[in-house]
């Protein structure tokens, strides 16, 4: 039982919960850009990412890692995760893969890599 309690108070659990909201925001913006504005997957993914990542950055700085949200940290986070987001979208466009596959794959990949980058580099 102690392990479950520790997990529920860990920075990863907080990061995961914020990630759920982030994912809903990202997917909603992606959908609107892709279907209503006729953006490609690359552009749709980066726009959705920027909206969601801005929310996540401030929420994670405060709740998950308990550090100040500086401009330098914000730009490092946005650049790192944004480049990854855009590359996923462009690659999946080139491979003619479904937009939903782009969203699922990027969401899973960004949860793991994003947490590691945030914990050990961006918010240290």
Swiss-Prot record:
Membrane topology classification: Multi-pass membrane protein
Q: In which pathway does it act?
A: Bacterial outer membrane biogenesis; lipopolysaccharide biosynthesis
Recorded source organism is Shigella flexneri
Annotated Gene Ontology cellular component terms: plasma membrane
Keyword entries, A-Z: Cell membrane, Lipopolysaccharide biosynthesis, Membrane, Transmembrane, Transmembrane helix, Transport
Q: What does the function comment of this entry state?
A: Involved in O antigen modification. Involved in the translocation of bactoprenol-linked glucose across the cytoplasmic membrane.
> What are the GO BP annotations of this UniProt entry?
lipopolysaccharide biosynthetic process
| Pfam families tied to this protein | GtrA_DPMS_TM
Q: Write down what this protein is called.
A: Bactoprenol-linked glucose translocase
Residues annotated as transmembrane: 12-32, 45-65, 75-95, 96-116
Q: Give the family this protein belongs to, as stated in its UniProt record.
A: Belongs to the GtrA family.
Intracellular or extracellular location(s): Cell membrane
Where is it chiefly localized?
membrane
